[in-house]
Amino acid sequence: MPAEQRTALVTGGTGGLGEAIARALHDVGHTVLVVHSPGNASIGAWLEAQTDEGYNFIAYGADVADHASCQELAGLFQADCFLIEILVNNAGITRDATFRKLSYADWDAVLRVNLDSVFNVTRPFIDGMLERGWGRIVNIASINGSKGQF
């Protein structure tokens, strides 16, 4: 168990790597908030399955690619009395196409979710972390950031 229970936020926390990270943070005693895409129709079933396996997550829907949506999300956390102490920027998408076949819309979507989201989600919480003298920010990147498809 950690010396102190912290509040952790995991973007993209409802699938794959994000779910594994959320579970690991829960396993060491942290309160874990997960962010999923707005309108995710399966979030209720996902939360129920997690609860059945002993994981208690609190889920919020937000468009991490949208700055205003992330500001609203930060307001919800504040209203719900959560101070974000651990932030894992894990949200990411891919568009499975070679660069030559990639449309501008797909390019823009990938950059907004994979890159802009780091700023959008981190910005509302970094000042509080600095003021409290404690905080952790982990940024996850895809292999496509190092080895793209050309």
Residue ranges and their predicted role:
Residues T98-F99, D106-L111:
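Substrate-binding pocket helix/loop in short-chain dehydrogenase/reductase
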Residues G61-E72, Y104:
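The beta1-alpha1 cofactor-binding region of Rossmann-like NAD(H)/NADP(H)-dependent oxidoreductases
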Residues T14-G15:
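Conserved glycine-rich cofactor-binding loop
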Residues T122-R123:
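A short, exposed helix-loop element centered on a Lys and neighboring polar residues
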Residues N90-R95:
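Conserved NAD(P)H cofactor-binding loop of Rossmann-fold oxidoreductase domains
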Residues V138-F150:
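Catalytic loop of short-chain dehydrogenase/reductase
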Residues H30-A45:
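Conserved glycine-rich Rossmann-like NAD(P)H-binding loop of the short-chain dehydrogenase/reductase
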